[in-house]
């Protein structure tokens, strides 16, 4: 009877170690200033979505009697999917960062409409990391440097 219980405990222990979680941490900076960071623990192969946005309302059209109001979504959206393979951790991820640069107003007939101008950063790729390794992805455009940093650790 004791042997049976030890076999059951050993089976559960093996299952628990096979289902170890992976801790993923990300950070996005622009010219050295932190724009956003995200951290999660998840199981092997499980996608974790990420969303840190604000809605900015703006006048998008209409007529004199009725103005059409729309929402501009600014901030960060994305997801991470870690996979373990031997001693490595493969992480598939995407990130989309949008910021409002300015919102000029223009007269259109008898109404005023807003014209949001945005900028941002977009990255989608898969990276192979060793346990605990940190990787940086740099992008330089028009004097603006974005750095996206990602790391993954088996728990």
Predicted features, each with a name:
Residues 18-155:
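Outer membrane pore-forming secretion/assembly proteins and partners of Gram-negative envelopes
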Residues 1-4:
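Positively charged n-region of N-terminal signal peptides that target proteins for export
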Residues 13-15:
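N-terminal signal peptide c-region/cleavage motif recognized by signal peptidases
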């Amino acid at each position: 009877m004791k042997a049976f219980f030890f076999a059951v405990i050993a089976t559960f222990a093996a299952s628990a170690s096979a289902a170890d979680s992976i801790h993923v941490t990300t950070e996005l900076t622009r010219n050295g200033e932190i724009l956003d960071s995200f951290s999660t623990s998840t199981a092997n192969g499980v996608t974790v979505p990420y969303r840190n946005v604000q809605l900015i309302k703006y006048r998008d059209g209409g007529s004199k009697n009725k103005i059409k109001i729309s929402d501009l979504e600014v901030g960060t959206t994305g997801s991470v999917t870690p996979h373990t393979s031997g001693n490595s951790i493969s992480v598939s991820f995407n990130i989309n960062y949008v910021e409002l640069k300015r919102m000029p107003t223009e007269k259109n007939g008898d109404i005023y409409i807003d014209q949001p101008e945005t900028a941002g950063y977009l990255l989608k790729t898969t990276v192979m990391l060793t346990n605990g390794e940190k990787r940086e992805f740099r992008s330089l455009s028009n004097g603006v440097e974005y750095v996206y940093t990602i790391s993954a650790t088996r728990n």
